């Protein structure tokens, strides 16, 4: 009775949630002062539990901030230490457990947190939980209820907690909004305490024992859950696994200077590949050497930096026509960069997304770690590298190049065991080359901007008729093709869909032309290049873009790149400054819709200068292709039918409008 009656004079709140959910910022908002460390970071900001309090309207409010207590990558010792500290700070009771979730970022980690709360605090705790959503500002004009309805796992979680939730904007500068959201939360807490007949009583011994059981269970099942890299990798290194194939083919990949050749020599147990420190790449071509290991033939293929090669597929096929059993990405500890990611992108472009299932990461220069723990270093150093390790299911090894004798042999054996295990898990199959798909580039825009000349520049030959005329030169869609950097490229030149002279006489011509445009595209990914003339953005350009959106859908710009012709008119200026300083709102709006993707052509260029600007465009297209999940504008039969319906409805509307204007005149 005394505990319940004191709830009017004191409220104790426990913040729970995954890393970066906004717990600390929420705690600061509740207390009305900055007491918990809060900043955006890819690593955990809060390392230990912290208790702070403040008197708000004659009521003491106690807030306990916590690190991510239920993270699947945290070690068991840290979990146990933090949960014990949390329980000590929470005693004797809590008026509410606040589960903090960031709007738009509900993930499996949040579900793990909810499950962890029940495991540690027991089923009774569910009756005392309130969900606090953060990042209210990200909702914009949308309703929180609508957002919850659209996310089934989140909707189920809200139902599990009987619809108890509120939302915070921790970025607001409005004092009224700050106090309003805090008071709303505290009213919900008071109501919850009254409904439950009192607060949640913390039994340190019971909860601590329950958590220890949870830790023990996790430790016994670490093969089924994502643990730290070392724990995860140990389960697949046993030498007694099914021997499977009698040969292992390993392709060494990595940026220039990563130490691929030295790694190959360590695996082979002899100096087979040339090594040396040089500003230039020591390995200029693919080289293959082999050794016998546990009655298997192990072929090691040393490769130059494949991100700089034009025809990687033909080069690799000379040595392994079917593809390798394993990719070994060699990268020095502490030096994982964008150059490594360029190598991965090249592999993905040639082998597809599945190549991650065939990759192991070899970290060299382990000797530079000194006394540091490798797992700790990986967790706390490079986010991109750690993410890659997780994507590869924690398959990695580390080499100490100062190792000799038995130690050198041991680290080579451990790596080969991992490779053997991975190959066995992949059914002893090779990672086969990705089926080459054509890249379709559709040139669109008003007439007179230089679409045909741009098409000829991309193709490197005079395929499309291009000359200065008062009337549109291109009457119908046509295509040309070339091979660029081993990639088949089809360029489709189109008429201006809003300036077709014969459409007025025969409205069906527009429908026919859209069909023809799409039929020129071959099997593969399709992207648009919106062509404008530098310094001459007109009302016709605006109309042309509006027409394209009406035909291909409002989101077609997601698959589009802006291209300005007459680059020579820039003189000593650059395109970035031109766009930045443009006072044309319509042009800037299109630029934003196209994701700020833009380039410029001088269609009078020839030779290497012409190829340089073509490379710049196709690089942007392939970057966009990668961003869009290796898929372009959908021209499936279903989508084509939808487009034709759009065209028919648009033609009918234009016809009615024309008749109406005629009547009014």
Swiss-Prot record:
It is found in: Endoplasmic reticulum; Golgi apparatus; Mitochondrion; Cytoplasm, Cytosol. Residues 222-233 have a biased composition (Basic and acidic residues). One of its GO terms (molecular function) is GTP binding. Residues 8-210, 245-435, 436-644 form the AIG1-type G domain. Residues 217-246 are annotated as: Disordered. Residues 65-68 are annotated as: G3. GO terms for cellular component: cytosol; endoplasmic reticulum; Golgi apparatus; mitochondrion. This is GTPase IMAP family member 8. The gene is GIMAP8. GO terms for biological process: regulation of T cell apoptotic process. The keyword Coiled coil applies. Belongs to the TRAFAC class TrmE-Era-EngA-EngB-Septin-like GTPase superfamily. AIG1/Toc34/Toc159-like paraseptin GTPase family. IAN subfamily. Keywords: Coiled coil, Cytoplasm, Endoplasmic reticulum, Golgi apparatus, GTP-binding, Mitochondrion, Nucleotide-binding, Repeat. Its main location: endoplasmic reticulum. Exerts an anti-apoptotic effect in the immune system and is involved in responses to infections.
């Amino acid at each position: 009775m005394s505990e319940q009656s004191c709830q009017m004079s004191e409220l104790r709140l426990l913040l729970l949630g995954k890393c970066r959910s906004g717990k600390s910022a929420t705690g600061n908002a509740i207390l009305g002062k900055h007491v918990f460390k809060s900043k955006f970071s890819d690593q955990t900001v809060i390392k230990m539990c912290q208790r702070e309090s403040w008197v708000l309207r004659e009521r003491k409010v106690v807030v306990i901030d916590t690190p991510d207590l239920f993270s699947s990558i945290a070690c068991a010792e840290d979990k146990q230490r933090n949960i014990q500290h949390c329980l000590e700070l929470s005693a004797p009771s809590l008026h509410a457990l606040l589960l903090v979730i960031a709007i738009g970022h509900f993930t499996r980690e949040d579900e793990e947190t909810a499950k962890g709360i029940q495991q540690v605090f027991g089923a009774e705790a569910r009756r005392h939980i309130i969900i606090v959503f953060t990042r209210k500002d990200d909702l914009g004009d949308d309703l929180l209820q609508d957002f919850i309805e659209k996310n089934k796992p989140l909707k189920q979680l809200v139902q599990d907690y009987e619809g108890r939730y509120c939302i915070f904007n921790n970025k607001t500068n409005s004092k009224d909004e700050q106090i309003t959201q805090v008071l709303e939360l505290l009213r919900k807490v008071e109501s919850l305490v009254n409904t439950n007949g009192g607060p949640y009583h913390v039994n340190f011994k019971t909860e601590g024992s329950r958590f220890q059981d949870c830790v023990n269970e996790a430790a016994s099942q670490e093969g089924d859950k994502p643990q730290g890299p070392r724990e995860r990798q140990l389960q697949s290194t046993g030498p007694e696994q099914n021997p499977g194939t009698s040969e292992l083919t390993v392709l060494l990949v990595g940026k220039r200077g990563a130490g691929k050749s030295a790694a190959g020599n360590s695996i082979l147990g002899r100096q087979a590949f040339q090594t040396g420190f040089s500003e230039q790449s020591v390995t200029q071509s693919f080289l293959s050497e082999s050794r016998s290991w546990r009655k298997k033939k192990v072929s090691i293929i040393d490769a130059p930096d494949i991100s700089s090669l034009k025809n990687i597929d033909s080069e690799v096929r000379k040595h392994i026509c079917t593809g390798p059993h394993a990719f070994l990405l060699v990268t020095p500890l502490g030096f994982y960069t964008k150059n490594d990611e360029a190598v991965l992108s090249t592999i993905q472009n040639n082998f597809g997304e599945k190549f991650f299932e065939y990759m192991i990461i070899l970290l060299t220069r382990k000797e530079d770690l000194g006394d540091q723990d490798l797992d700790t270093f990986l967790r706390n150093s490079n986010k991109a590298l750690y993410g890659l390790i997780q994507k590869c299911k924690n398959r990695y090894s580390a080499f100490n190049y100062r190792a000799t004798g038995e130690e050198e042999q041991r680290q080579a054996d451990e790596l080969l065991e991992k490779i053997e295990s991975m190959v066995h898990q992949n059914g002893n199959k090779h990672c086969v080359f990705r089926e080459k798909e054509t890249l379709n580039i559709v040139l669109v825009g008003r007439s007179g901007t230089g679409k045909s000349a741009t098409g000829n520049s991309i193709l490197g030959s005079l395929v499309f008729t291009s000359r200065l005329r008062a009337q549109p030169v291109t009457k119908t869609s046509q295509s040309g093709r070339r091979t660029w950097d081993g990639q088949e490229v089809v360029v489709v030149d189109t008429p201006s869909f809003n300036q077709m002279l014969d459409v007025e006489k025969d409205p069906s011509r527009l429908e026919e032309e859209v069909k023809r445009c799409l039929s020129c595209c071959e099997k593969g990914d399709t992207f648009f290049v919106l062509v404008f003339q530098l310094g001459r953005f007109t009302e016709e350009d605006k109309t042309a873009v509006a027409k394209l959106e009406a035909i291909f859908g409002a989101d077609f710009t997601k698959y589009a790149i802006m291209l300005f012709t007459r680059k020579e008119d820039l003189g000593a200026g650059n395109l970035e400054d031109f766009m930045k300083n443009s006072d044309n709102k319509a042009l800037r709006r299109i630029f934003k819709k196209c994701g700020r993707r833009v380039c410029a052509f001088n269609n009078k260029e020839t030779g290497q200068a012409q190829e340089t600007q073509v490379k710049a465009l196709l690089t942007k297209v392939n970057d966009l292709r990668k961003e869009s999940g290796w898929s372009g504008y959908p021209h499936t039969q279903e989508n084509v039918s939808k487009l034709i319906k759009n065209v028919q409805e648009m033609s009918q509307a234009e016809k009615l409008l024309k008749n109406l204007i005629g009547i009014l005149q």
